[in-house]
């Protein structure tokens, strides 16, 4: 059985085609900078063949046409026609109150997904467009919606409710939902294997640090609390997102800058975070260069980011009763940036959480798992590359093979 996973971004399309029997990857790739004249297609085949092509891809529809050309390319020998693909799993950022688990795509679920898109206007609408196109391109494939919010369905009301009028929650579903759930699900299972401990016995703090970042407290193998909220804007300092702020800033800056609240929200999402503080870049690699050159704002950006992470780790240690099995760093920054890991855990050695500097310094490869805890550390500190696609694959396979 061949299953395709699709991860749609606002200007990108990430895909992996699996042969499910042994989770063999037949081809994977990304189509980046969609809607620009500098679009990039990167693919990697099962034989390790890497290709990079520059094209002008005007839309996600055109990107999907390119995907079909890649999959049916006779030289690559992946598939002969689209009907060979029996299942497609879509990563959906926001499932709102409607979707507690991954679900089969049908008329009803697509309709419900459209209704909740107002909760994620930056993410869900473009994913829906891609879904509607894939329904035409792959008419015979069963398709599945896999939600980043579903993992957090186990949070208690005291963790997910805001202290706003209760009617906002009951009437408008205003609450914390959390994100990066596909990643947290994979990491939790992986840690259970690494530590040789039942998943339901695990207490973890997982840091998904990338251009978008969040942190998850896992209690007895289930999501207990998380930093992102109603939207992915809440929580940690991110590449271009502010993370936690005083909400009164929005009407104040709207007045001072003579801009609409919607425009201020856009600034908080796209021009803030590391980019906003550093005055340089949303890319931490560029900011570290600034630190080396003694640039004040670059140093400040790194300090603010690490300080916010440290505060969240401390608070999650408290809600987990200071009883945790491991702290895990994952995603692009979490796996490669030893400096942020060191700063984020500085001081925790006093309560038995200690990094080994040499191991930490060596853990920079985005594909390699590492144990960076010192011999004295009472808590494991692990670096584990995430694999959201594998979570999508498993959920898709389980749903499309389930007896009706």
Swiss-Prot record:
Keywords: ATP-binding, Cytoplasm, Kinase, Magnesium, Metal-binding, Nucleotide-binding, Transferase. It comes from the Bacteria. NCBIfam families: ackA (TIGR00016). It comes from Borrelia turicatae (strain 91E135). This is Acetate kinase. One of its GO terms (molecular function) is magnesium ion binding. ATP binds at residues 14, 208-212, 283-285. GO terms for biological process: acetate metabolic process; acetyl-CoA biosynthetic process. It is an enzyme of class 2 (transferase). GO terms for cellular component: cytoplasm. It is found in: Cytoplasm. The gene is ackA. Mg(2+) binds at residues 7, 388.
